[in-house]
Amino acid sequence: MAIDFKKKLASRTITSKTNPIELYGTLDRKSVAGPLRPAQEIVLSEWYTKRRTDRDLIIKLHAGEGKTLVGLLLLQSLLNSKEGPCLYICPNKYLVRQVCSEADKFGIPFCTFGESAEIPNDFLAGSKILITHVQKIFNGRSVFGTDNNYIKTGSVLMDDSHACIDTIKSAFTISISKSENPEIYSKILTLFNDDMIEQGEGSWLDIQTGDYNTFMAVPYWSWNNKKTEMLRILSATQEKRQIYYTWPLMCDQIENYCCYISGSKIEISPYNVSIRTFGSFSYATHRILMSATIQDDSFFVKGLEFSPEAVRIRCGTKNKNGLAKKC
C-alpha cells in the first residue's frame, strides 16, 4: 500500500486560522499543554477584535500569565494572514532558548540563526517565526541591515521590552575602558586636555589620576571643533570590540553625539537614538511590545517612535488594583 506523504505532511502543518484562540485549538500541542488561561484569552480576543490592524501595540501581562504563548500566537496569526515575515525579539540568548522551548511545546513552527550568520529562508519566505535576541538586530553591523539597506519585515514583536531598551540605547554608545584600551583613552584625554582644564582644572586632575567617581562632559564647542581629530582616532581603532559594532552608526553622525570622561572610561553617546537606522524594526507593518512591567514610557515614543496613542491605550489584563488599561 502506497504511503501518501503529502497527506502526512499536511497533517503536521497549522491550519491557516487567523483568530489566535481558534488557532490554538489547531496546534499539534504536546500532552503537557492544556487550554489557554483566562488572561491569555482576554488579551488575544481583544487584540483580534479591536486592535488587529493597529501598527503599534503595547501588551502588558503580569508574571505567570503566559505572555510568551500570547506573543507566539499573535505572530502565527499574522503569518497566517500573510503579514510576515514575523520576528520575535528576546532580550538575551537565554530567553531565546526559553521561547524556542515554548514554541516547540505548543507546536508553533519557528526558526533560529544556526552557526552561520545567514537569515533563515523560512523566515524570509514568511513560513516560520524567527526567534532571536535584541543584539542581533540592533547593532551597527546587523545582519538585518541598516539605513536604506535593510531586510523588510511584516510583524515584529519585542518580548520583555523594558529589558531590551538598555541594549538598544547601548547599540549607539561607544564605551572605551581605560584598563582595556589605555592607548585610545590616553589619546582622547590628550586631544581635549586644554579645553577640559578650562572647564575644571581640579576635576580634570582627578580624572587623570584615575578617580572613578569624577566625570566631566566635553564641551559641545570643543567636541564640534575637534570632531575630525576624534573621528581619526576612532577610525584607526574601529576593529576594537568596544568600537566595532557602534562605529558604523556614529561615524557620519558625530556632531549629534556627546562625550563624557571619567577616571576609568570614556563614553560617547548620541543626544537622541535614531531608531530609523534599523528599518527592519522601524518600518515593520506591525510592531508589538510585550512586558510584565513598563517603566520607561517616554522611550517608546521618543526612542522607538511609537504613537502616543499606543502608549496611552495598552493591551493587557487589569492588575490587582484594577488600574491597568485593556485594549
Predicted regions and their residues:
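A short beta-strand-to-loop transition that corresponds to the Sensor-1 phosphate-sensing loop
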Residues: 92, 128-136, 160-161, 290-294
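Conserved Walker A/P-loop ATP-binding site and its immediately adjacent core
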Residues: 63-115, 136-139, 296-299
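Conserved motor-coupling elements within RecA-like helicase/translocase cores
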Residues: 105, 116-130
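Internal, well-ordered domain-core segments that constitute the primary functional module
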Residues: 116-118, 131-138, 148-163
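Conserved SAM-binding loop
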Residues: 36, 88, 130
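Conserved pre-motif I regulatory segment
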Residues: 2-60
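Conserved catalytic network of the ASCE P-loop NTPase/AAA+ motor domain
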Residues: 79-81, 122-124, 147-151, 279-282
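Conserved coupling segment at the C-terminus of the helicase ATP-binding
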Residues: 25-28, 41-42, 48, 52, ...
